[in-house]
Amino acid sequence: MARFSVCGGDDGEGPSNNNHQSRKRQRLPSIDENEEDAETSDAGSSGEEDEDETQNQGMRPESEDRGSTSDDSDREVVIEERRFGKFVNSQSSSSSKDSPLSVTLLDPDVLDCPICCEPLKIPIFQCDNGHLACTLCCTKVRNRCPSCTLPIGYVRCRAMEKVIEASRVSCLNAKYGCKESTSYGNRFSHEQVCVFTPCSCPILDCHYTGYYKDLNNHVRAEHKDDLISFVWNTRLTISLDLNKKTTILQEENDGHVIVVQVFRALHAVYVSVSCIAPLTPGVGRLSCRLAKITVDSLLKQGFMVKNIQKVTNEHPEDGFMLIPSYLFSGNDNLNLQIWIGHGRIFVHS
């Protein structure tokens, strides 16, 4: 137990020190009145009794003296702890002070700019009434606080800047495997390039969502019968069902999942090719070449494969080939040749 000095100095001898100690203890509300009376009567006792007491104490065994000293020390500690209204833990390590503190915000909007509602970024400004604004908003409002019309944009709020600088948030894709943590103001910038952006299974009525590499394994394990295998840079002939609209391909080695979709138009068919993967620089891009061959004609086109996270039925705006209806004679099946590879290998071939 930690030791504290109640008297504030060395232990003295004589009645003057005893009276000083008694007066200090009388001011402690946690000590019983009986204790105070006993101390007062002890202080007022005759010198002979004190001398006898001293002689008797000198005749006590050493172990008893040590026990008495320990009791007095414990009593001093309790008095000091009660005096300050708290208990002191003397064994707390200094390392706990340096460890990060986890704080939960009940309203995360307090870290957003109240004008544009975007995450606050340094520098942060305040008016004389304490209203906050980011740099861009100070310019937009012409340095006039929209809450109180006082000037804003000249005085920085250092306290909020320290809070923003010290705040770290986990990526929204943490449950899919991302271990990155960023400052609160830059979290959107990371999420736009996070490779763990969730992707949905392209198989109809399957609700699996996860990291795109995990999704590749899921498709291979759970939907093997619904896939058509292909090899990079190798020609594959496929028959597209115009009523089914979607055909799923998977690369034999890497497991990349490719979605080929057909969309009917008035006198033509759109054929789009997409890859189930996030739109991030960390994921490589693919290209493809489509060819429609008949006895009298050849229609061929190369383009970049678009990365998507979920299959939709919207007509594509790019990354497709338009095939006139006369090339497939109005049948419900469209036979095509397709090549898929890394980079831009098939864009201009």
Swiss-Prot record:
GO terms for biological process: protein ubiquitination. Zn(2+) 2 binds at residues 201, 206, 218, 223. Pathway: Protein modification; protein ubiquitination. A zinc finger (SIAH-type) spans 166-224. Its EC number is 2.3.2.27. Pfam families: Sina_RING, Sina_ZnF. The keyword Ribosomal protein does not apply. Residues 1-77 are annotated as: Disordered. The RING-type zinc finger domain is essential for ubiquitin ligase activity. This is E3 ubiquitin-protein ligase SINA-like 10. It comes from Arabidopsis thaliana.
